[in-house]
A protein has these predicted regions:
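Conserved N-terminal entry element of GNAT/NAT acetyltransferase domains
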Residues: 2-7, 145-154
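Conserved GNAT-fold acetyl-CoA-binding loop/helix
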Residues: 3-31, 39
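Conserved beta-strand in the GNAT
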Residues: 43, 49-58, 64-66, 71
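Conserved acetyl-CoA-binding loop-helix of GNAT-fold acetyltransferases
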Residues: 72, 78-91, 117-118
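Conserved GNAT acetyl-CoA-binding A-motif
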Residues: 93-106
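Conserved beta-strand-loop-alpha-helix junction that forms the acyl-donor binding cleft
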Residues: 103-113, 129-135
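Conserved acetyl-CoA-binding loop of GNAT-fold acetyltransferases
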Residues: 117-126
Length: 154
């Protein structure tokens, strides 16, 4: 997972300078807890090669589940793998009984906002990012409200 995250954000060396520790912690956590890895994330593979990774935090259920890391290796970007990966994660997350929302936080200068919006996420908050990661843009907060979806399907 670490190598996928590092490669996915290689377009700007400041990403690794700011987030390398977090990427390593995520990799270590999932390696040390394989029983969690299979329930709350997955790797996207093409021809047996891991090209992407996504994970989510279910601890705030039933109020919401928050998507964490969501990355595709640089060589595979622009081929629909990111949207397919996110769509599959949403399918799995929607299986939680009584879940009200799916949330994600990203940054305005990344390409991620377009991907989230393309699968139904709606922006509900935007905050200035004055810290060391300011180069990545404002913090954007997105959600999909599932209670409305469920009411529409009833």
């Amino acid at each position: 997972m670490y190598s996928i995250l590092k490669d996915a954000y290689s377009f700007d060396e400041r990403c690794a300078q700011c987030w390398d520790g977090n990427w390593r912690e995520t990799d270590d956590f999932f390696f040390d807890h394989p029983e969690i890895a299979d329930k709350y994330g997955f790797a996207t593979c093409f021809n047996g090669e891991p090209i992407g990774f996504i994970c989510w935090d279910p601890r705030n259920r039933p109020e919401y589940v928050e998507i964490g890391h969501n990355a595709i290796r640089t060589a595979w970007k622009g081929n629909g793998f990111g949207k397919a990966q996110l769509t599959e994660a949403l399918r799995r997350i929607r299986e939680y009984a009584g879940l009200k929302e799916i949330r994600v936080r990203t940054n305005s200068n990344l390409i991620a906002p377009r991907n989230y919006e393309s699968v139904g996420f709606v922006l509900y908050d935007r905050k200035e990012n004055p810290g060391e990661t300011a180069f990545s843009g404002d913090d954007l907060y997105y959600r999909i409200q599932l209670q409305r979806e469920q009411m529409g399907n009833a």
